[in-house]
Amino acid sequence: MKLSLRFLSVLLLIAFMVLATTAEVSPLDNKICKTRSDRFSGVCISTNNCAIICQQFEHFDGGHCEFDGAFRRCMCTKQC
């Protein structure tokens, strides 16, 4: 009985160590902030065009089309 209890506790300890080393911890600074584009005009149809406007003219990391009420708007994104 002692041998099996010892074996079980060693096995559980190894399992916890494996779980602790493989668990991914996401850093807190990976948040994406978004704001409505000032330069994009009209309804946003192409996410690619939105991203180009946000990157080249507004100095953001990227952009995408998103529903803002009843219309699709260009939303610029960057890391917070």
UniProtKB/Swiss-Prot annotation:
One of its GO terms (cellular component) is extracellular region. Gene3D superfamilies: Knottin, scorpion toxin-like. Keywords: Antimicrobial, Disulfide bond, Fungicide, Plant defense, Secreted, Signal. The keyword Secreted applies. Residues 1-23 form the signal peptide. Disulfide bonds join C33-C80, C44-C65, C50-C74, C54-C76. GO terms for biological process: defense response to fungus; killing of cells of another organism. It is found in: Secreted. SUPFAM superfamilies: Scorpion toxin-like (SSF57095). Belongs to the DEFL family. PANTHER family: DEFENSIN-LIKE PROTEIN 1, DRO1 PROTEIN-RELATED. This is Defensin-like protein 8. It comes from Arabidopsis thaliana. The gene is LCR73.
